[in-house]
Design a protein with these regions (language model features):
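A hydrophobic alpha-helical transmembrane-helix feature that marks the membrane cores
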Residues: 1-230
Length: 230
């Protein structure tokens, strides 16, 4: 009986160590991924990537195509160094795309403050969701289907609003995106804590994309509500 208990304890301890290692490596790679994101944003601002705004639909489809291509490559190579390299590549690309909304924000007299506010809000969301997932030890995997449906609805609404250009719909999409992707951070980190995600490259990609979308959506809301022209 004692032998069985010892084996079970060792197995449980080993699983906990693996989960902690995946979580630690995810946070480390997530922090590193912010470097190419910032570099990409700086390059995009310098290169005036706003020219892509001339064709919103084509830009949207091009963005999705390149992003999904990166994500496919990362998942196929997540157990090798190439997966890490592709992950850093997509974060640089996302930084380039981020430069468009940053240029718009910097066009306001309080642009720097709005960007800082969005960054601070995103950080607060991340730390709150990460703490809940880690401390509560609850299994939030049941949220997955609902969050996926929510993400698809947001994607379709964003695509439709490219044609309709309804300001109120744009605000609603941004608000919904903040809620859905904040919940995705909770869901993704919970999967690591519960042992549902054992690859830190895949985990980093999921959490990074959620953080990115929370930041962009928060910035859009802040610009719409507090933006000041000279």
């Amino acid at each position: 009986m004692n032998t069985n208990f010892d084996i079970a304890s060792q197995g449980s301890s080993g699983l906990a160590l693996q989960q902690n290692r995946v979580l630690r490596n995810t946070y480390m790679l997530l922090a590193i991924s912010m470097v190419p994101t910032v570099l990409g944003a700086m390059v995009g601002i310098q290169m005036q990537f706003s020219f892509m705004a001339g064709s919103p639909l084509m830009s949207f489809l091009l963005f999705l195509g390149i992003a999904w291509g990166f994500m496919y490559g990362i998942e196929k190579n997540k157990d090798s160094g190439l997966g890490v390299a592709l992950l850093l590549g997509i974060t640089f690309f996302m930084g380039l795309m981020l430069s468009r909304i940053l240029q718009v924000a910097l066009g306001f007299s309080n642009g720097g403050g709005m960007i800082a506010m969005a960054a601070g809000g995103t950080g607060a969301v991340f730390f709150t969701m990460a703490t809940i997932a880690t401390v509560s030890k609850r299994d939030f995997s049941g949220m997955g289907k609902f969050l996926f449906i929510g993400m698809i609805v947001i994607l379709l609404a964003a695509l439709a609003n490219i044609f309709f250009q309804i300001p109120a719909l744009s605000l609603a999409i941004s608000a919904a995106a903040v809620m859905v992707f904040s919940a995705y951070i909770l869901y993704d980190i919970s999967r690591i804590v519960q042992g549902g995600e054992t690859n830190y490259v895949s985990a980093t990609l999921s959490v990074y994309l959620s953080i990115y979308n929370v930041f962009v959506s928060l910035l859009q809301l802040i610009m719409a509500l507090t933006g000041e022209r000279d």
